[in-house]
């Protein structure tokens, strides 16, 4: 179960409806929905404006990311000190 059972949530819902009223809750819900919609629209327009133009050269961004480097040498084992508590 958890901290709150379904009965607890029902009591909390009834108290909230009694305190604020259904009209105020409906208005609050629509205001929150409009705010979320506006936020998503703003994020989408910012992404479109900040997106750089595609490079016109023959190489793509993926070519530069996939280049690998080989490191020459040998691995050495390092002894870690033992803690004495």
UniProtKB/Swiss-Prot annotation:
Membrane-spanning residues: 1-21
Family statement: Belongs to the TatA/E family.
InterPro entries, alphabetized: TatA/B/E, TatA/E
Record GO terms (molecular function): protein transmembrane transporter activity
Taxonomic superkingdom: Bacteria
Keywords from the UniProt entry: Cell inner membrane, Cell membrane, Membrane, Protein transport, Translocation, Transmembrane, Transmembrane helix, Transport
Disordered: region residues: 43-85
Subunit record text: The Tat system comprises two distinct complexes: a TatABC complex, containing multiple copies of TatA, TatB and TatC subunits, and a separate TatA complex, containing only TatA subunits. Substrates initially bind to the TatABC complex, which probably triggers association of the separate TatA complex to form the active translocon.
Its job: Part of the twin-arginine translocation (Tat) system that transports large folded proteins containing a characteristic twin-arginine motif in their signal peptide across membranes. TatA could form the protein-conducting channel of the Tat system.
Compositionally skewed regions (Polar residues) per UniProt: 56-73
Keyword Transmembrane helix among UniProt keywords: yes
Any one GO BP annotation for this protein: protein transport by the Tat complex
Gene (UniProt): tatA
One cellular component term from this protein's GO annotations in UniProt: TAT protein transport complex
Gene3D superfamilies: 1.20.5.3310
Protein name: Sec-independent protein translocase protein TatA
KW Cell membrane (keyword) present: yes
Major subcellular location class: membrane
Subcellular localization: Cell inner membrane
């Amino acid at each position: 179960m958890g901290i709150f059972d379904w009965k607890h949530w029902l009591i909390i819902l009834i108290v909230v409806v009694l305190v604020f009223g259904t009209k105020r809750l409906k208005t609050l819900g629509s205001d929150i929905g409009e705010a979320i919609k506006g936020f998503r629209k703003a994020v989408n327009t910012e992404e479109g404006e900040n997106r750089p133009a595609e490079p016109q050269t023959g190489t793509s961004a993926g070519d530069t990311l996939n280049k690998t480097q080989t490191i020459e040498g040998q691995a050495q084992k390092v002894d870690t000190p033992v803690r004495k508590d």
